[in-house]
């Protein structure tokens, strides 16, 4: 297993979308009260005094939708100001991104991932949820993507969750975005966290099937740059951008895992695919437990992580019953 140096941080469990695979509008979700969410000060304390001393140097801000946090710019500035931080990125649905992109860039953010599950506004509307404004959302998301590209975010990555019978017919169109643009499209296998009923009904498509479609159309070569995350990177010959495939269902990448996840209410989770070994850091911090003690607890969990990842992995892929949605975990 790789050295664990990457923390995904959910800033908020709320979102302005209700995507089918994450927090469907058919579910009656109970969102956290504002007082239950880590404050910016608490979060920066944990990053500075607990995680960085343990070797964490790369951080990603997620949600829910992180741009719903009114203090998002302060959080970005605070993390960037820590000298040990090597990388800060964000994952967003881009609905609120266009007016914020320049400010985020000036605050120090350089890398951004944007969820874009369809290029067809009607299909996109079906995926993001039923409300009176849903048909207008694709245009705002696309404007946010264009603005981020214009401002200079690099790399700019587009995350695509493929759902059988919903958007699987768009694989080639989405892959084609990388040909003339220095964009990076990442296909993510649909998994049961968030909507187990839809998962059981629709199933999922292995990454290799998507690669075969793309390979048959254009050819496919190994990407020139391979990250240290879970994505297998490829490239259409001559394309400016790359294609990534995150295959948590079909191709175990536990040996490459380098991350933990911190929920908006301060629960530290060592593995996405199961709920073993979670630590409640927020309650401990508010109860006056020292950051030295919290650091020791996280260190012990880091030592257990390989066993949790390998031995408990199947509990998250077959018959799993998750108590938290993807929006609560932080993706």
Curated annotation (Swiss-Prot):
InterPro entries registered for this protein in UniProt: Aldolase_TIM (IPR013785), Elp3/MiaA/NifB-like_rSAM (IPR006638), MoaA (IPR013483), MoaA_NifB_PqqE_Fe-S-bd_CS (IPR000385), MoaA_twitch (IPR010505), MoCo_biosynth_MoaA/MoaC (IPR050105), rSAM (IPR007197)
Pfam families linked: Mob_synth_C (PF06463), Radical_SAM (PF04055)
Disulphide bridges, residue numbers: none
Positions that bind [4Fe-4S] cluster 2: 254, 257, 271
PROSITE patterns: MOAA_NIFB_PQQE, RADICAL_SAM
Pathway(s) annotated for this protein in UniProt: Cofactor biosynthesis; molybdopterin biosynthesis
NCBIfam families per UniProt: moaA
PANTHER family (UniProt xref): MOLYBDENUM COFACTOR BIOSYNTHESIS PROTEIN 1, MOLYBDOPTERIN COFACTOR SYNTHESIS PROTEIN A
Name of the protein described by the UniProt record: GTP 3',8-cyclase
Species this chain originates from: Acaryochloris marina (strain MBIC 11017)
